[in-house]
């Protein structure tokens, strides 16, 4: 038996079949499911996030789904704290935490920990917002490029939340976000030669995706069109009607939602919205693959294989997750 309690990560790109395999594992093992998805946290965003149905969630409860209103933000640090609490509760009940989802930044935060960033400062944020109103976000992006060119290269000028956070970190602490992350990398390795991580668990990491990329692309297109047929536009209309929601929020910037939002604003035709929604989802999958290719200690499975459950169970035994 492992000296640390077991945990399972089930990763993969969007539309790869993670949820189905997670539920099959939950039928076979004493698991508790914990969602690792930055869009599934939001209430009222069900169709466009491919959230499991109420019936499935009743049968297979997931922690960290429907925990925020779309007007609220949710950081990787908040996820890490919530996930660690959920994992500890599952372990205390003698169950295995099974974390499933495709938000790779969240997995990274769990495995590596987070850099010690300054907390939010309301006065600094208010000043930045006033500057943005007066000068525009492009001007703030130029400011960031002067003090933290690495972050400026990663953050688009039209991403106000991340742009404001990077400037806030610098103004509050006097050290750039990039420098703080470099210090973290020097102190904490992703994995050392022994595979140790920052989590107090023996972690088995599974990944699922179609072996052929065109299969995933076809799945993405089919699923997006199905979402539209299931009432995705009406779902976004309900969000669009709220005075406290706008296109700059993380919830509305979620893939699919921002394209339908632009359609409702009259910026896109129906055909353009559909095409851009599919393209944006494919781009998301590409980014997820990029993360996964750099990941250590992953056991890959083909989405189209008919024996993924027994293969996963066999692997979990080989890495001492199961007796």
UniProtKB/Swiss-Prot annotation:
The gene is miaA. This is tRNA dimethylallyltransferase. Belongs to the IPP transferase family. It comes from Pseudomonas paraeruginosa (strain DSM 24068 / PA7). GO terms for biological process: tRNA modification. GO terms for molecular function: ATP binding; tRNA dimethylallyltransferase activity. Monomer. The record marks 103, 125 as: Interaction with substrate tRNA. Residues 37-40, 161-165 are annotated as: Interaction with substrate tRNA. Catalyzes the transfer of a dimethylallyl group onto the adenine at position 37 in tRNAs that read codons beginning with uridine, leading to the formation of N6-(dimethylallyl)adenosine (i(6)A). Its cofactor is Mg(2+). It comes from the Bacteria. Its EC number is 2.5.1.75. Pfam families: IPPT (PF01715). InterPro entries: Dimethylallyltransferase, IPT, P-loop_NTPase. ATP binds at residues 12-19. It catalyses: adenosine(37) in tRNA + dimethylallyl diphosphate = N(6)-dimethylallyladenosine(37) in tRNA + diphosphate. Substrate binds at residues 14-19. Disulfide bonds: none annotated. Keywords: ATP-binding, Magnesium, Nucleotide-binding, Transferase, tRNA processing.
